[in-house]
Amino acid sequence: MSRGGIQGFESERLSQILAARRLSQAQLAALVGVSPATVSKWRSGNQAPERETLERLAGVVNVTPEWFTRAPSAKVSLPLFRSNASAHVAARAMLEARMEWAQDVALALSEFVDYPTLNLPTRQFKEPDEITPDEIELAASECRDLWRIGRTAVPDLALAIEGAGVVLIREETGISQIEGLSAW
């Protein structure tokens, strides 16, 4: 930081919270009682909020002040959205930020819980466009064999994929244009 404020403020966390709460810098500034330029400086890393301001900021967005000083975990991949073309950029940004939080939680939990070993068929696709319906059918068949779940209806698919080592998060988002997303 070049000027003032608390030590260790992670500007990436501010970007995450803006996306996750679907707030503009100006809206957040009004809620916290600072200028939009100040929020811009926090976001760029040129300035950090003072302790009292950080507490107001945290209260407004419903996180602890300490959360803004935690380094974000490394992104595993860009999310792949299952959505129609009309899905708004802000909605995608919100879900991407929330996925990053889910990854943070899963990583923290892994310190206390042993996740099952990942047990999925391997594919060499580089782009989602390369995946054909036949490839999906083949992968589904391989999953059924790997997981020993037979060829009949799967009573609890979420339980089956969690047992195969996949971390599954289910959340009602209120964004009807996006049916789901994944990252690896």
Regions found by a protein language model. Give the residues of each.
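Short juxta-domain linker segments that transition from a proline/glycine-rich
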Residues: M1-W184
